[in-house]
């Protein structure tokens, strides 16, 4: 009977059902189960989930396993021209690290990484612009809070005769912390945890460097 057409068809149908029921969750992913497009149950292998990675089962043809990355992910912003408090223009290039902390909320609001990166572009870009606008260029350039004036490499390389900058009050690292603090709650509503934001690169136009020299001479 097993080798008859009916028996073979039954075996094929059974295999389809079994494979449709079982699925494996990797250590690097977390899963939200949906039934007819709506989430059911708790996320699997999430940070605060009771169920972990391994073999799991769902109702075939009715439920779908939606997988999301559990690892730390990177965000790389586009260089953007911004204005400092002292009305100088600088091109700021930022990057950050983030992760999906609440896969259910992430699924309900964003669904995929492309949408998440687009939202991160908007929020981090906006908060970076706000922070830069509240501080003078010297605070963006310098990355330490040393009270002793020191040579700034970028200005020195520009060929100017004056490269000694005044001491700073805050410094770039504190500005990065301010960007992170402002952006974190805004992306948190989408189930995203923003781990850090860093200023990767700063570019000045020649006119900006000349203005810095003029101010330091005066």
Residue ranges and their predicted role:
Residues 4, 11-12, 74-75, 103, ...:
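Generic signal for short, ordered secondary-structure residues
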Residues 2-22:
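Single-pass alpha-helical transmembrane signal-anchor segments
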Residues 198-218:
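Long, charge-rich amphipathic alpha-helical coiled-coil "stalk/tentacle" segments
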Residues 2-6, 62-71, 166-172:
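N-terminal start-of-chain detector that recognizes signal peptides
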Residues 8, 47-56, 149-154:
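Short low-complexity stretches enriched in small and charged residues
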Residues 19-133:
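Hydrophobic membrane-anchoring helix/hairpin
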Residues 84-87, 91-93, 97-99, 116-205:
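Amphipathic, coiled-coil-like alpha-helical scaffolding segments used for oligomerization/assembly
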């Amino acid at each position: 009977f097993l080798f008859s057409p009916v028996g073979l068809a039954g075996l094929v149908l059974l295999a389809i059902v079994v494979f449709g029921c079982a699925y494996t969750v990797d250590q690097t992913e977390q899963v939200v189960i949906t039934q007819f497009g709506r989430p059911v149950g708790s996320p699997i292998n999430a940070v605060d989930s009771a169920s972990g990675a391994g073999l799991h089962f769902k109702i075939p043809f009715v439920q779908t396993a939606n997988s999301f990355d559990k690892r730390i992910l990177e965000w790389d912003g586009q260089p953007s021209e911004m204005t400092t408090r002292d009305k100088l223009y600088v091109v700021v290039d930022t990057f950050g690290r983030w992760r999906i902390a609440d896969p259910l909320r992430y699924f309900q609001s964003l669904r995929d990484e492309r949408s998440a990166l687009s939202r991160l572009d908007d929020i981090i870009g906006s908060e970076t612009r706000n922070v830069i606008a509240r501080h003078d260029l010297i605070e963006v350039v310098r990355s330490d809070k040393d009270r002793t004036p020191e040579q700034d490499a970028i200005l020195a390389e520009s060929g100017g005769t004056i490269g000694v900058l005044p001491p700073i009050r805050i410094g770039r690292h504190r500005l990065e912390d301010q960007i992170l603090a402002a952006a974190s709650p805004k992306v948190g509503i989408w189930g995203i945890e923003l781990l850090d934001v860093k200023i990767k690169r700063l570019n000045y136009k020649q006119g900006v460097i000349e203005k810095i020299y003029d101010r330091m001479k005066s």
